[in-house]
Amino acid sequence: MQMPRPTEEDKARFRSLVPDDPRVQVRAMFGNLGAFLGGHMFAALLGSDIGVKLPAAELAALRERGARPFGPTGRGMSGYLTVPEGDDAAELLARAAAHAATLPPKATKR
């Protein structure tokens, strides 16, 4: 299976949607991008799809609006959904970052 690759425009759009917060890091991951806060990935770019990690109740509401599983296999990564067309992606990424901020920071790797 080949991993979807984003265009430079996709990458620029993703970066523009990530909250402007000094705690947030955008890092390359397998040719795609991930947004992290406290070591927790809260959003990712896979090809042209943007996925967010939100609390279960918010994921359920997002599913009702047409969100589909997010991940390279089509099966989906646990806790992540693809931002549906027409949704306010910047708002969803901000909510995902706020959720990540409530989690204890992950230990840094040496």
Describe the role of every protein-language-model region.
Residues 1-110:
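Charge-dense, helix-prone N-terminal extensions
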